[in-house]
């Protein structure tokens, strides 16, 4: 049995859950630093007397960094290792977030937010690739959705920090708290193993075998001494053209369109949700309270997606959740009472974040090991283009007459288009090993 198959056939146990928690907490810190700017913007706009264009660029500059980070981290992860890039990117965005607290003006804040984006964008595709390569096919979808659920926890922490800190101590302290995850790099170095397919592709066969034996020993299964490596797993040259050659062209087109649409809608909605509610006449504290409740709805969204993704499959679950999110966005935009805002806001949050969990499962399943992180990184990078566009579009629409309703009508149409792309171009990958999908 080859090394990758030995990992694939391990029983689910402590090793897998430890990996999920350690990487998941890193994912949570990513969400904390992403989410905290949404709440800081409500007071920063007033403190610095920012124009809509300036406030839009504070958010968009981060997505420019995220796009570049996603592109380069994929190639770097295939060259230097998933673990190394995962730890490095976490350190980058944590330190840059703390530096934002000391920004004396808009120019410096934009520079620091760009660096934050480099780290944030680089971490996510690498994290999901690393976990995917250790989880057996029959539960991989569930584990990746559970990994993505840490994103909801991160936004919840961001909302709690903002609710208790910003009104009393100011946004500078909130940024400093966002820098604390830098300490967590030590845990990653100690607890996270390097990817087996990566080690094989780099010719480090003995190191990969030793790691597999160590995992087998801890799992309580017979330790195999023979080293077998499949030819398909051997080191290959990675190029951008591979993403658009043969069977991968359709997959890449589907992923790029879906990533662009879902990132555009997610960050356009949730990054500006507190500010949109304030513009509707609610106080800053009220907007924080409402968004906090909506964020809580993300957690059952992840759980339901984790259950459905191994029953209905990736394609049906993803398209269904995004379609339901589109309906929720429409009615949220029409809501004129607190009750309706909360009901449709919670459903919007439930379906949107559940869809994210499925998307992070689905993305690395489209490519073989030697271009997996590279392909996932490019899909994420194209998505960040949507993140760059969304804040600018939303800030301009917000100042128009009936802007709130127009914004959510736009997101409804975008989400419906994304669901259609999945139905038309998507391939089902449920229950297949990563290597068989890439063949």
UniProtKB/Swiss-Prot annotation:
Signal peptide: none annotated. The chain crosses the membrane at residues 20-40, 57-77, 84-104, 108-128, 143-163, 169-189, 253-273, 288-308, 316-336, 338-358, 374-394, 407-427. It comes from the Bacteria. GO terms for cellular component: plasma membrane. Keywords: Cell inner membrane, Cell membrane, Membrane, Transmembrane, Transmembrane helix, Transport. One of its GO terms (molecular function) is transmembrane transporter activity. The keyword Transport applies. It is a multi-pass membrane protein. It is found in: Cell inner membrane. Disruption phenotype: When compared with a nadB mutant (with blocked de novo NAD biosynthesis route), the nadB-niaP double mutant requires at least a 200-fold higher niacin concentration for normal growth. Functions as a high-affinity transporter of niacin (nicotinamide or nicotinate). Probably substantially contributes to niacin transport when its concentration in the medium is very low. Belongs to the major facilitator superfamily. Sugar transporter (TC 2.A.1.1) family. PANTHER family: SYNAPTIC VESICLE GLYCOPROTEIN 2 (PTHR23511:SF34). This is Niacin transporter NiaP. The lineage of its organism: Bacteria, Pseudomonadati, Pseudomonadota, Gammaproteobacteria, Moraxellales.
């Amino acid at each position: 049995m080859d090394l990758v198959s030995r990992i694939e056939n391990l029983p689910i146990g402590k090793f897998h859950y430890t990996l999920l928690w350690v990487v998941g907490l890193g994912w949570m810190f990513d969400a904390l630093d992403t989410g905290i700017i949404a709440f800081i913007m409500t007071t920063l706009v007033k403190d610095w007397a920012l124009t809509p264009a300036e406030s839009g660029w504070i958010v968009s500059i981060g997505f420019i960094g995220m796009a570049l980070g996603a592109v380069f981290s994929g190639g770097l992860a295939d060259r230097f290792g998933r673990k190394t890039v995962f730890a490095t990117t976490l350190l980058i965005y944590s330190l840059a977030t703390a530096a934002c607290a000391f920004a004396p003006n808009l120019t410096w804040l934009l520079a620091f937010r760009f660096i934050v984006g480099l780290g944030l964008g680089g971490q996510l595709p690498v994290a999901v690739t690393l976990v995917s390569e250790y989880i057996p096919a029959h539960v991989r979808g569930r584990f990746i959705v559970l990994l993505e659920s840490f994103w909801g926890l991160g936004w919840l922490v961001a909302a709690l920090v903002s609710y208790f800190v910003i009104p009393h101590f100011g946004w500078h302290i909130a940024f400093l708290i966002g820098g604390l995850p830098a300490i967590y790099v030590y845990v990653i170095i100690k607890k996270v193993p390097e990817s087996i397919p990566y080690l094989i592709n780099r010719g480090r066969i003995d190191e990969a075998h030793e790691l597999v034996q160590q995992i087998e020993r801890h799992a309580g299964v017979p330790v195999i001494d023979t080293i077998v490596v499949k030819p398909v797993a051997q080191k290959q040259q990675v190029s951008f053209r591979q993403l658009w050659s043969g069977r991968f062209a359709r997959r890449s087109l589907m992923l790029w369109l879906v990533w662009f649409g879902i990132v555009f809608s997610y960050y356009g909605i949730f990054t500006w949700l507190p500010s949109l509610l304030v513009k509707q006449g609610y106080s800053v504290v009220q907007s924080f309270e409402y968004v906090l409740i909506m964020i809580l709805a993300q957690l059952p969204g992840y759980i339901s997606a984790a259950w459905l993704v191994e029953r209905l499959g990736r394609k049906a679950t993803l398209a269904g959740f995004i379609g339901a999110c589109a309906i929720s966005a429409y009615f949220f935009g029409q809501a004129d009472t607190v009750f309706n805002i909360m009901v449709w806001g919670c459903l919007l949050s439930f379906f949107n974040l559940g869809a994210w969990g499925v998307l992070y499962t689905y993305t690395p399943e489209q490519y073989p090991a030697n271009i997996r992180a590279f392909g996932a990184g490019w899909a994420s990078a194209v998505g960040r283009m949507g993140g760059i566009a969304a804040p600018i579009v939303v800030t301009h629409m917000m100042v128009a007459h009936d802007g709130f309703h127009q914004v959510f009508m736009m997101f409804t149409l975008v989400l419906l288009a994304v669901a259609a792309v999945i139905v038309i171009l998507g391939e089902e990958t449920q229950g297949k090993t990563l290597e068989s999908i890439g063949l």
